[in-house]
């Protein structure tokens, strides 16, 4: 069976892995997933990520915990294949009053809501992380 929404699958694997206190989670790799993992690492939500180059590339994300609790409190898909959500530069959401991050896909690539606001850009809101 084919996967309808690979990004939602990635976010669910991270959510479930942290709920089960796993050290890392593995999933099929894709360019967009790697870009999202890079953003999560830059923002401090995951420890690291690695791509295993095999016949089927696999993305492994090392999860991050603080005093035994997952660093990621909520990770939620916003724009999905059946309902795309686009926001202009003035409409970009502030997740948890600025404490969280919204990952936005713009014409210049993936960026956080803060970076998109600074660059005066809007785009497709991929997910919220807090």
From Swiss-Prot:
PROSITE patterns the record matches: RIBOSOMAL_S8
Cellular component GO terms, alphabetical: ribonucleoprotein complex; ribosome
GO biological process, one term: translation
Keywords: Ribonucleoprotein, Ribosomal protein, RNA-binding, rRNA-binding
Record-level Gene Ontology MF annotations: rRNA binding; structural constituent of ribosome
Its biological purpose: One of the primary rRNA binding proteins, it binds directly to 16S rRNA central domain where it helps coordinate assembly of the platform of the 30S subunit.
HAMAP family per UniProt: Ribosomal_uS8_B
Membership in a protein family: Belongs to the universal ribosomal protein uS8 family.
PANTHER family to which the protein is assigned, alphabetical: 40S RIBOSOMAL PROTEIN S15A (PTHR11758)
The name this protein goes by in its record: Small ribosomal subunit protein uS8
Lineage per the UniProt record: Bacteria, Pseudomonadati, Pseudomonadota, Gammaproteobacteria, Alteromonadales
